[in-house]
Amino acid sequence: MERTLRKKRTGRVVSDKMDKTVVVAVETKVRHPLYGKTINKTTKFKVHDEKNEAKINDRVLIMETRPLSKDKRWRLVEIVEKAK
């Protein structure tokens, strides 16, 4: 599988307490099937951060990868925006 076919997501770092791992919350907008209201749905991913460079509230780009542990299937590509 080529790297260009892998899923990419953008989200915010909500936890950086683990070594070489950050938790990234990705928010998507979903319409309710019956009522039609737009709802914000948040999914949390454990992301591999080799250099421990992402900090809390950073906006990051993540990419799907091979399973690195029981829960980690994503890796950090770049930090889009640093936290203030």
From Swiss-Prot:
SUPFAM superfamilies: Nucleic acid-binding proteins. GO terms for molecular function: rRNA binding; structural constituent of ribosome. One of its GO terms (cellular component) is cytosolic small ribosomal subunit. Signal peptide: none annotated. InterPro entries: NA-bd_OB-fold, Ribosomal_uS17, Ribosomal_uS17_bact/chlr. CDD domains: Ribosomal_uS17 (cd00364). It holds the Pfam family Ribosomal_S17. Keywords: Ribonucleoprotein, Ribosomal protein, RNA-binding, rRNA-binding. One of the primary rRNA binding proteins, it binds specifically to the 5'-end of 16S ribosomal RNA. Part of the 30S ribosomal subunit. HAMAP family: Ribosomal_uS17_B. This is Small ribosomal subunit protein uS17. The lineage of its organism: Bacteria, Bacillati, Bacillota, Clostridia, Eubacteriales.
